[in-house]
Amino acid sequence: MREILHIQGGQCGNQIGSKFWEVVNLEHGIDQTGRYVGDSELQLERVNVYYNEASCGRYVPRAVLMDLEPGTMDSVRSGPYGQIFRPDNFVFGQSGAGNNWAKGHYTEGAELIDSVLDVVRKEAENCDCLQGFQVCHSLGGGTGSGMGTLLISKIREEYPDRMMMTFSVFPSPKVSDTVVEPYNATLSVHQLVENADECMVLDNEALYDICFRTLKLSTPSFGDLNHLISATMSGVTCCLRFPGQLNSDLRKLAVNLIPFPRLHFFMVGFAPLTSRGSQQYRNLTVPELTQQMWDAKNMMCAADPRHGRYLTASAMFRGKMSTKEVDEQMLNVQNKNSSYFVEWIPNNVKSTVCDIPPTGLKMASTFIGNSTSIQEMFRRVSEQFTAMFRRKAFLHWYTGEGMDEMEFTEAESNMNDLVSEYQQYQDATADEEGEYEEEEAEYEQEETY
């Protein structure tokens, strides 16, 4: 069985993560004590992807929960599904990282990391054939960003050939809870570019907009935002957990989506998103799903795909539908909007179909796109970073934990390189082949070292 090991870190990661487990528990018919109460053998057929089987038929999530302060974990533990997790898999410190990346990455986090790795190792050894890891964290705080990236780099060392997928919540343009977010995010991206295989980019502001505009919620809570994220997370992996006509796994996803190794930051979207009131007035059809899924307002990060071009994209449809219709609709989108796709990657949109829809829906779809417009997010964070770094504002919090200014400069230039790489491929046309072949050769050389 192709298992996935789920890791959640920091306040944001633990809140998204616990919401995700609520969704997956529902889909697999597992109740709050870990007993199976479902009604279809399909729910159990590949339940091992996310669960270990314990004695007397209990299912236990293959999840590691970490944080540098006990608060969030206590609330996970006292929440509706708190008793389903294995108690040993809660790893927490007492000090907190105080929104400081250096504390999470170098001091406080470094003290806790070995006990986290012990739990990860234990879970990985129990796996039949571990496919990869999925990490939930935010990039604005201290623990999820600093300690999260530390863990990712340690796992990279120990399991170099396993997939590493992250769900990373970026700081939002207008909503900010700490002033040092640009520092933390830039230092994290510096790590993610090198050590992660695929990053699903999320941000609170885009999620707020979806709740507000599309779902018509007047005062969206973090619970509502996290519910959106968890729907997407469950959609990304549904092919692994349920039988389908066109299956995919984390590696196939990466192969189809990543044309150049550093460009692995994806926009995600989900359909159908309808307000509660108007649900019964709509009939879900494949064309409608497709239309909503490609809609710029549906993207869960604050970058507008219309400002760039898609290098590649992947769509996962769930429910009983005709694959032929899915393919026709996807082709239709590409033909009508051909200027938004790079022409030097033919057939760059892949679709997969999984027979089992999410709980409470007839059909649904998840969208993952590798668009050059994601540079807007990096550019925005980079501008904020530069504004503060130029004056060395707040730097003493980081240098006090033993960091060097050099590291900031490196992270800044790595992020700016990433932006210009996206820009370069956005402007590229199919007839400049010569230049690209040379560059690809350089890339391959870098890869082999």
From Swiss-Prot:
GO cellular component labels: cytosol; Golgi apparatus; microtubule; peroxisome; plant-type cell wall; plasma membrane; plasmodesma; tubulin complex
- Binding positions for Mg(2+)? 69
What subcellular locations does the record give?
A: Cytoplasm, Cytoskeleton
For this entry, list what GO says about its biological process. microtubule-based process
The protein's UniProt keywords, in alphabetical order, are:
Cytoplasm, Cytoskeleton, GTP-binding, Magnesium, Metal-binding, Microtubule, Nucleotide-binding
Q: Where does GTP bind?
A: 11, 69, 138, 142-144, 204, 226
Superkingdom of this entry's organism? Answer: Eukaryota
List all Acidic residues biased stretches. Answer: 429-449
Q: Which cofactor does it need?
A: Mg(2+)
- Chain positions covered by the region annotation Disordered: 422-449
- Which pairs are disulfide-linked? none
Coiled-coil segments on the chain, per record = none
Q: What is its main location?
A: cytoplasm
Gene Ontology molecular function: any one: GTPase activity
Pfam families found in the cross-reference section: Tubulin, Tubulin_C
Subunit and interaction comment: Dimer of alpha and beta chains. A typical microtubule is a hollow water-filled tube with an outer diameter of 25 nm and an inner diameter of 15 nM. Alpha-beta heterodimers associate head-to-tail to form protofilaments running lengthwise along the microtubule wall with the beta-tubulin subunit facing the microtubule plus end conferring a structural polarity. Microtubules usually have 13 protofilaments but different protofilament numbers can be found in some organisms and specialized cells.
Per the record, the similarity remark reads: Belongs to the tubulin family.
Tell me the function of this protein.
Tubulin is the major constituent of microtubules, a cylinder consisting of laterally associated linear protofilaments composed of alpha- and beta-tubulin heterodimers. Microtubules grow by the addition of GTP-tubulin dimers to the microtubule end, where a stabilizing cap forms. Below the cap, tubulin dimers are in GDP-bound state, owing to GTPase activity of alpha-tubulin.
Q: Tell me more from the record.
A: There are nine genes coding for beta-tubulin.
The molecule here is called Tubulin beta-7 chain
- Can you name the source organism? Arabidopsis thaliana
Its encoding gene is what? TUBB7
